[in-house]
A protein has these predicted regions:
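A broad structural signal for short, well-ordered beta-strand segments within beta-sheet-rich domains
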Residues: 1-6, 11-12, 255-257, 298-300, ...
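Zymogen propeptides/activation segments of proteases
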Residues: 87, 93-112, 130, 237, ...
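Preferential activation on post-signal-peptide N-terminal prodomains/segments
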Residues: 1-234
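Short, non-transmembrane alpha-helical segments in secretory-pathway proteins
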Residues: 27-30, 34-45, 164-177, 226-264, ...
Length: 347
């Protein structure tokens, strides 16, 4: 995630925090109180959101819109909400702390909270405030062409170089984890070179690159635990990750939730890879994993197994002004720091 902590005389910025990192703990404690006491939600605006970021505040950008109930669970509380938000900010306003939410599109909201400004100040004291800026604050002229909430940490972080191996999961491991008979003889190679394993109506298809897919054919062998008919965001994500983690090679990258959608009968989740909080994106724009739940049954799954290893040397970054100039050629483009996986090389 990206985070910014703003005080009276400076701002701390990070593009590599994770919700389980030690440095996130003060923010997590604050957000637990803010989300737990938020009430009286009302519509707000982009201008109000940006204005709040110039005051004493804590800002978190989760990179993609995620259910508020899932974000609350990451903070250690339960919150009932149908909203999905990409970013939020806890900011001081008229002697109180308000919660501002952005859905990643055109909708903004604001809530009052029971949190005192002194609690926010205590969080600010945990961070060394520098001169991190948002694109909408940039006075050079470069930032005006970018997405307004593009965050420019100063100084720029030093990220390790990553090496990548296109890893394959053994057929035996797949059969075991996905609940197939390990001694099945119902397997063949299709015309495209993929290995296909069939058991009843369930099918595993393994491509030559190691990417595989699974379909249940209506059978209910694989499922996630849920208290009701449809799993909550927490139940779905934790249950699916418990399965996928058994199929991801050991290394310096893990999966994180990219997208969540739920209808009356089904849940669709996509995941990407991240290393130390920095996203790894495939050049073709595809996700690392996609999972469909019918009720609480895993009805379809695909995974692109990759093994990433961090080196001791730093990965070079473009100078900020140069990166802003290049990104600004596309009006409204978001400038962010991440790794790009082109298949055999990683930048």
């Amino acid at each position: 995630m990206r985070a910014a902590v703003t005080g009276e005389y400076g701002r701390y910025g990070s593009i590599s925090l994770t919700t389980d990192s030690e440095s996130f703990t003060p923010i997590k404690t604050l957000l637990r109180e803010v989300l737990g006491s938020a009430r009286s939600r009302m519509d707000s605006s982009a201008a109000a959101f940006r204005s709040a970021l110039g005051k004493p505040s804590v800002y978190c950008d989760f990179l993609e819109p995620l259910p508020v109930s899932y974000l609350a669970d990451l903070m250690g509380i339960t919150a009932e909400s149908e909203l999905s938000v990409r970013a939020l900010a806890a900011a001081e306003q008229n002697g109180q702390v308000v919660l501002l939410l952005w859905d990643g599109g055109s909708r903004y909201y604001q809530c009052v909270t029971a949190v005192q400004p002194s609690t926010l100040t205590e969080v600010l004291d945990h961070f060394e405030l520098g001169v991190t800026a948002f694109a909408f604050e940039d006075l050079s002229g470069y930032g005006q062409h970018l997405a307004p909430l593009s965050l420019f940490p100063d100084p720029l972080p030093e990220l390790p170089q990553l090496t990548v191996t296109e890893s394959t999961v053994s057929t035996e491991t797949l059969l075991s984890v996905l609940g197939f008979n390990p001694h099945t003889n119902s397997r063949y190679t299709d015309a495209g070179g993929a290995e296909v394993v069939v058991e009843g109506d369930r099918v595993i298809r393994i491509s030559g690159s190691g990417t595989f897919s699974y379909t249940s054919g209506g059978e209910t062998v694989l499922s996630v635990e849920s208290a009701g008919g449809l799993p909550t965001p927490r139940e779905a994500v934790s249950g699916v990750l418990e399965l996928l983690d058994q199929l991801i090679p050991e290394g310096d990258a893990r999966l994180y939730l990219l997208e969540w959608q739920q209808s009356e009968t089904a849940t669709f989740l996509t995941f990407g890879y991240q290393s130390s909080g920095v996203p790894i994106r495939f050049a073709d724009g595809s996700a690392a994993a996609e999972v469909t739940l019918s009720g609480n049954t895993i009805s379809a799954l695909s995974l692109r197994p990759r093994q990433y290893s961090a080196a001791s040397s730093a990965s070079p970054l473009l100078p900020l002004r140069q990166a802003m100039s290049i990104a600004g050629r596309t009006e409204g483009a978001e400038l962010s720091i991440g790794y790009a996986d082109t298949g055999c090389l990683l930048y």
